[in-house]
Amino acid sequence: MVYFVGAGSGAADLITVRGMRLLQQAHVIIYAGSLVNPELLQYAKTDCEIHNSAKLTLEEVLQIMQEAQAQGKMLVRLHTGEPSIYGAVREQMDALDAFHIPYESCPGVSACFGAAASLNLEYTLPGVSQTLIITRMEGRTGVPEKESIERLAAHQASMAIYLSTGMLRELSRRLTAGGYAPDTPAALVYKATWPEEEAYICTVETLAWVAEVHGITKTALVLVGDVITHGSYQKSRLYAADFSTEFRQAKSNATQTEEKQEKQCED
């Protein structure tokens, strides 16, 4: 049995409880050594067989999986962040299907959510944005034209842009070409939730400058949108007094006034 486990965004204690237990039970672990916090390997058994996939090809990873299955061993494939986002897991799953090897997935905390926690952000502020776009610049892996930065920027939604730290000048140019103003709030978060995390609030126009000043060349996430400065937004209707839910009846203006008067009398 193979388990694809999300390691979380960086901090070792951000792995899920289920993910931690799977690591504790595994006979074999293949981890993404270039990005996964090595502290997570402390959960492994003393006799666990551990492989660093940064040094392996896809074929070599699959060979280890086949050998573990043949020996009746449980294997954890430990991916950085959340495996379903830029995790290259589908090609492994398709191969396992061909080999008739069963597998399951265990989610993890992706970097965009780790970064939001570090900055105390809400991506979906009423009156500002109700959409989060997760994307990347094209590099050695292409991006469909319909998902270009310019087309996505036209939505003026909150954006989390992965794998683009080395292309920040081009990214800024394309974001503004798509409709963002140069002074639109942005953030550059290096190694979100890791002990060495660095986070900087800037603008779309100053992204590259901030990276250069602080020597950030890789492993950073770019966030874009007015939610970053949260200066003007509407309160959620969910907790409004005149809003009914399954658990609470709306109060009329008269009822609210009476309650205020009663409270004033009590005071």
Regions found by a protein language model. Name each.
Residues V2, E60, Q71-L75, T131, ...:
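A contiguous loop/helix-start segment that scaffolds small-molecule binding in enzyme catalytic cores
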Residues M20, Q42, E67, T124-L125, ...:
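Short secondary-structure boundary/capping segments
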Residues M1-V109, G114:
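Class I S-adenosyl-L-methionine
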Residues L14-R18, P38, L62-I64, N120-L121, ...:
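A generic local structural motif
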Residues A44, L119, L175, G179:
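Active-site catalytic pocket residues across diverse enzymes, especially alpha/beta-hydrolases
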Residues A11, E82-H155, E198-I201:
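Class I SAM-dependent methyltransferase SAM-binding "motif I" and its flanking Rossmann-like core
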